[in-house]
């Protein structure tokens, strides 16, 4: 009788574990699904100077070997956008003022401007920070909450955590206060 109960209990235990294991396996995404999801969050952008900027963006975290250790402002803009033009001097000023702590990456968004015209525009607005061009820009805009209106900017702390989202032109005082606060926390 003891052996029968022991056998029955053991059989019951293994049967329960087997069903649970099947459920866990069924509900767990496959390696290829996880890899695909990860690859969809990796962006390889090219600047007007041909430099590559790579980063991963997922769940309000920005990870990049290219941008590591700095406060990063990702800015979506277009040359035809008046509010975008309004904030460019702010970015240039703060990039010059905090070169070791702060970097702007401007992503050209829905702007069919030629390379020569873009170079002239950047010179006119004294853009001393990278501007990315190319096919991946649209994919980045989709990853950042499917951007539809510009300018739109995202500020990330040195550890890659998003600190602030700006819709419309960025206010210089607000941005500088955030940079100083983050820089001093380092």
Residue ranges of model-derived segments:
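Short pre-active-site segment immediately N-terminal to redox-active cysteine/selenocysteine motifs
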Residues: 70-72, 76-80, 111, 149
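Active-site acidic short loop of glycosyltransferases
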Residues: 68-70, 100, 127-128
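N-terminal targeting signals for export/organelle localization
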Residues: 1-53, 184-186
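Conserved redox-active cysteine motifs that mediate thiol-disulfide chemistry
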Residues: 68, 76-93
């Amino acid at each position: 009788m003891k052996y029968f109960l022991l056998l029955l209990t053991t059989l019951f235990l293994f049967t329960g574990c087997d069903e649970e294991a099947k459920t866990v396996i069924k509900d767990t995404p496959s390696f290829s699904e996880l890899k695909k999801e990860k690859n969809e969050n990796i962006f390889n952008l090219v600047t007007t100077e041909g430099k590559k900027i790579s980063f991963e963006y997922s769940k309000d975290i920005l990870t990049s070997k290219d941008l590591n250790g700095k406060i990063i402002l990702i800015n979506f803009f277009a040359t035809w956008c008046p509010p975008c033009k309004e904030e460019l001097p702010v970015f240039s000023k703060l990039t010059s003022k905090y070169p070791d702590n702060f970097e702007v990456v401007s992503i050209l968004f829905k702007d069919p401007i030629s390379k020569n015209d873009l170079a002239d525009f950047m010179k006119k607005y004294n853009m001393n920070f990278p501007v990315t061009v190319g096919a991946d820009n649209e994919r980045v805009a989709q990853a950042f909450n499917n951007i539809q209106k510009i300018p739109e900017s995202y500020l990330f702390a040195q550890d890659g955590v998003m600190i602030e989202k700006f819709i419309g032109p960025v206010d210089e005082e607000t941005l500088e206060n955030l940079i100083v606060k983050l820089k001093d926390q380092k």
